[in-house]
A protein has these predicted regions:
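Hinge/lid segment of periplasmic solute-binding proteins
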Residues: 116-170, 193, 219-222, 231, ...
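C-terminal capping/gating helix-and-loop segments adjacent to ligand/active sites or protein-protein/ligand interfaces
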Residues: 154, 369-378, 388-446
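Conserved N-terminal structural module of periplasmic/extracytoplasmic solute-binding proteins
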Residues: 10, 24-120, 126, 139, ...
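Pocket-flanking alpha-helical
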Residues: 74, 93-130, 142-161, 170-172, ...
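Short, solvent-exposed loop/beta-turn-alpha elements that line the ligand-binding surface or hinge
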Residues: 132-145, 184, 211, 228-251, ...
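Glycine-centered hinge/linker elements that transmit conformational signals in sensory
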Residues: 196-198, 238-269
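Extracytoplasmic/periplasmic substrate-recognition and gating elements
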Residues: 74-79, 84, 181, 262, ...
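Extracytoplasmic/periplasmic solute-binding protein
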Residues: 160-164, 169, 193-241, 257
């Protein structure tokens, strides 16, 4: 497997921040505290009583990581009876607000879930709030991580976290709807437009879009411009934004509006949320969805109307342009970081290593993402068709670039998402879009 993950994918470890912090803060109403007696065979001898706190955002019952974290808390206490882990979960924007407030108030936990990329985690690192963990990492742990996967965990030459799982954005197609419409799963842009026309003629919504949250539309421009400019062209523009005001990026903006004018998306796309978009696709309300493989649990749930009816493919190529079907949007996932003021950094890093590997191995087995850790001894016979298809696509990858809001500085990330929303609402022209993009700040990663 080729792994050319950009440093911006700082472990999907997605957007911004400030101030002072302290060590061990408790959870709130959702806090779980584990106890119990005894220790597992091979566990460590009990020593000083230690409590570590961890905040995460895996709270949905459809998120396999929720149970993985809960299990890790119980298992780790059995292995280390003197160590108690208190975990608290909040999701989405609420989590971003909570963690930002906690750091500002000096009430951050020992271990924090962080979104990937420079627009979220890097300001915490620059402010000195997070602990470099190099000196605490064993060679054994590092040897279990797949080649290249620590790159996204490294800032300014220092490792700050460990990978868990990695994600890949795919085009999801409801084969039942395609068959009913007499449409072909697209491999080129022209075939995509033909499929959209046939699906519309059959009275079906071609593509589900939830642009109320802005980032789903951003994913579309991310990949369309990768097909027009190629990932190398994207990297050049991240380093020199003036290049956004050039033919490949204007062409990508034109392609986005071509989709809108072709009635590719649901009419209420600007008022539909991400959750509603995924739920709608799982309910069979749209024939296509472009998203990362974290949508698999929703599509494959027993309650899903599309279970067993969906295939995932690489986004169609645009003939005559620089991009190829082996260039992907994706990268290693968000991760967990240690508070620099943690009173027990060695124990915190040991638990971080345990948790990260467990999410990587168990999460892969349960469809939570693709592996960042050695999984040769993991039974993958239970993987779904979608998980297998997505893993096979990743095997073909020659280049990966993470979501753009992880690449730009925080304010510019918001500007970019706003511009894509305006583009899709037909409020600005492709030329105006490109001109505005050219005024963004260069990414420090390129």
């Amino acid at each position: 497997m080729k792994k050319i993950f950009k440093k911006t994918s700082a472990l999907f470890v997605a957007a911004s921040m400030t101030l002072a912090l302290a060590a061990c803060a408790g959870g709130g109403s959702g806090t779980e505290k584990t106890g119990g007696e005894g220790q597992a065979e091979g566990g460590s001898d009990a020593g000083e009583e230690i409590t570590l706190t961890i905040w995460h955002q895996s709270v949905s019952d459809t998120d396999p990581v929720k149970k993985i974290i809960e299990d890790s808390v119980e298992e780790y206490h059995k292995l280390h009876p003197n160590i108690t882990i208190e975990q608290d979960g909040v999701t989405g924007e609420q989590y971003k607000t909570k963690i930002k407030t906690a750091f500002a108030a000096g009430e951050a936990p020992d271990i924090s879930y962080m979104f990937s990329g420079g627009s979220f985690v890097k300001p915490y690192i620059d402010a000195g709030y997070l602990l470099p963990i190099d000196e605490y990492l064993s060679e054994e742990t590092k040897s279990k991580v797949l080649p290249g996967m620590l790159d996204g965990c490294t800032f300014d030459g220092k490792v700050y976290t460990l990978p868990t799982v990695t994600f890949l954005a795919n085009l999801y197609c409801n084969t039942e709807m395609f068959d009913k419409a007499g449409a072909k799963i697209p491999t080129t842009w022209d075939e995509l437009l033909e499929a959209i026309e046939k699906l519309n003629d059959a009275g079906m919504t071609p593509i589900m879009m939830g642009e109320k949250d802005r980032w789903p539309g951003m994913y579309w421009y991310d990949i369309v411009s990768a097909r027009t400019a190629g990932n190398k062209g994207l990297e050049e523009a991240f380093g020199d934004p003036s290049k956004f005001n050039s033919e490949p990026f204007i062409k990508a903006a034109e392609k986005m509006q071509e989709l809108v004018n072709a009635k590719a998306f649901n009419e209420n796309m600007m008022s539909m949320s991400y959750d509603e978009m995924v739920e709608g696709f799982a309910a069979g309300q749209g024939a296509m969805l472009f998203q990362a493989n974290w949508v698999h649990p929703s599509i494959q749930a027993d309650t899903s109307a599309t279970k067993g009816k969906v295939t995932c493919v690489s986004f169609p190529v645009i003939e005559g342009m620089a991009g190829s079907e082996t260039e992907f949007s994706g990268g290693s996932s968000d991760g967990y970081y240690i508070n620099v003021n943690c009173e027990h950094p060695e124990e915190a890093v040991e638990y971080l290593s345990y948790l990260s590997e467990k999410i990587g191995r168990d999460g892969y087995q349960q469809g939570a993402g693709l592996p960042c850790w050695n999984t040769e001894d993991v039974d993958t016979s239970g993987l779904s068709v979608l998980d297998t298809e997505s893993a096979a696509l990743m095997e073909t990858g020659t280049s990966y670039i993470t979501w753009w809001d992880n690449i730009f500085p925080a304010e510019d990330s918001e500007t970019y998402k706003d511009l894509v929303a305006q583009l899709m609402a037909l409020k600005i022209t492709p030329e105006e879009f490109a001109e505005s993009m050219s005024k963004l700040s260069p990414s420090e990663f390129y």
